[in-house]
UniProtKB/Swiss-Prot annotation:
It comes from Dictyostelium discoideum (Social amoeba). Residues 305-356, 372-475, 491-559, 575-631 are annotated as: Disordered. GO terms for cellular component: cytoplasm; nucleus. Pfam families: Pkinase. This is Serine/threonine-protein kinase dst1. The gene is dst1. InterPro entries: Kinase-like_dom_sf, Prot_kinase_dom, Protein_kinase_ATP_BS, STE20/SPS1-PAK. It comes from the Eukaryota. Residues 29-281 form the Protein kinase domain. One of its GO terms (biological process) is protein phosphorylation. The keyword ATP-binding applies. Disulfide bonds: none annotated. ATP binds at L35, G36, K37, G38, S39, F40, G41, Q42, V43, K58. Residues 334-345, 401-410, 425-444, 454-473, 510-525, 597-615 have a biased composition (Low complexity).
Amino acid sequence: MAIKKPINVKQLSDKLGVPILPDDPQTIYHIQERLGKGSFGQVFKAVHFANGKVVAIKIISLDDQEAIKDVRKEISILAECNYPNIVQYFGSYFKDHQLWIVMEYCGGGSVSDLLQVIDTISEDEIALICREALKGLNYLHEFKKIHRDIKGGNILLNDRGEVKLADFGVSAQLFNTFSKRNTFVGTPYWMAPEVIQENKYDGKADVWSLGITAIEMAEGLPPNSNVHPMRVIFMIPREESPALTDKSIWSDKFQDFISKCLTKDPAERPTAKELLNHEFIQTKKPLSILSDLVENCKTLINNSSMFEDEDEEEGNYSTFVEKKTPSDDEKENNNNTVTNYSTVITKDDDDGSNNYSTVITKDEMYSTVITKDDAQTDDDNNNFSTVITKEDPPTDEESDSSCSSSSSSSRNITSPISKRKPRQPITNSPKISPISSNNINKIPADNVVSSNQATTTTTTTTTTTTTAASTTTDQDEGDVKNIVNKFQLNKPITSSNSTSVTPQKPPFPSNNTTTTSNINTPIKPSNGLKKSNSNTPVQLKTSGDKTPTTTPLKNISNNNSVIYNNSNNINNNNNNNIIAPKSPSPTTGQKIIKTNSGGVLKSSGGLSSKRSPSSKPKHSSSSKEPKESLSENLQNIYRNDCTIQLPFLTLNNISSDYLLSIDYRYNDFKSSLDDLCADPNLISSKLSFSPYIGNLIKSLSYHKDIQENELMTPKESVQNTKIVNDLSSTVKTIFRL
């Protein structure tokens, strides 16, 4: 392990701009529990040993220089603030290459936390929260500070109902009354139009964010929450100001307050001080209604936790392993000595409605039986069993011996499946190859049992299952015939919820109506991509398309083998999916099916799927966020402290002069968009956008120019093509091309 470089505490104190207390924090505070992960580290609840005061401690590793750079802003703001509506800062400590920042603890959580419990907040409660938040903002603005990230998640409440502004990680200091910021920072859904357009802005940007937060408290979510964040960045400056969805249930003064906060022109938008005189804010309700709100939410959470604990206790689980050697009489029937092992896992509910049983047996003849029976229903198709065997077809005597051995080993096993109806067998199950091209989408190969194997193990499986279930005598003959494989071999695998709408990954319109992806013609990397005729309509690529090279791909060693399709193996049957590499684009709503080393089909799409570490590509993709920090000029364009970023951009190899240039040939956005859409009228209507989006298109033009005009190695060509596809997909998402 590498030895960490010693840190000079005095230099660290000078760097942060606040004194570092010399004491060991663990001798002063007792850590109780982790509250979560903050913007730049972990946050813990702690208690002061001497006075018993509860505090929140943010612990940050000093090895992360970016985190230190960002947290310095928060500490400098908090250390200078002393106001009831601002989270109080108590001091900083240094221990084990970690910075401990001690702050005020707010036991009520954030407004967003409350909305997770009660969905919406009443109008009187919203008025109080907005009034207290405006007091905190007015204090900040008078000291020439901007919060820049006001939202429900950064407005905290304590147990007494007091409202505190928190998380000053992106706050900025205004050095004089007339100075304004012009950096792109904040959370997209709460962001003011002037911030997105990178115009000059001041504390009135916080007022806009508070208006969005008021809608968030009233409706549970901010406006446009079902839209992709990058799309929202484009929508906010162009569309009308948001408003409450159902105005009939809210008072006129509340609606007027929101409209004042969400005035598009910042020059006409009132300040925080002016809004403190608004009729909606002049409420006579006491802060005790907020403390009652916090208490009610805590009660609901505690009751919910109690119900969950009771549900877990209702399930009766039993697991036992039994090893038994057959008796002398059983050995006489079989010349070989057989030792049987069985593992049984059962769960029984009192009402008998949810009964699960798993029986696994293994003997010296290497037969394995895995059986899972769901609760008895009128539809027998809901009950299924899987039989896997490694033995040769036994003789009649061996079958009889196997039956008696299984009965002996499982004699004391009791299972709830004894009350279930016999299942009807499926006859003439076809033998299917696990990697057959005709059946690649129908059934996982590991679960396929051939017809002769099913016949071989019917007797053994039946005896194990029926004895484990303690079946009655009227089931003797029926159960021998009822161990079957209930997989539906003729149904393709289907995926649901592939187009679920969420703020992170909404479905985007596509020109494709079939289930297959477009197959592109291979290109030669050495010659680059040729520009298409501008008179010829350009067919848009889908987000799942890849641009392969003519260089043969050999020995691709990955746990999940990827099958590249060409024009010779395309099947027009709608039931067959094309197996293709997964696109890195975030806009795809289509599920890609690929096989693992065992031939089992695996879904890699969908919002809830997670890739295991073993399924990561062998080579790091150029679409990853660069590890190196960007130059100062690039920081002005793609800021690290911006909440919403494009993580796949690799910008270190792009000249700062290129991105910062105002020369027309570097800003010909129309030609870049022409390659993505053939409709000139549509393009001309999309050319009004912020410099931030313009720089994105500049990056696209840069990489396309390299692809078309410079010689590259095959590897460089593939990487550059991938970047072009990623950027093109993002631009098409923003402009809905």
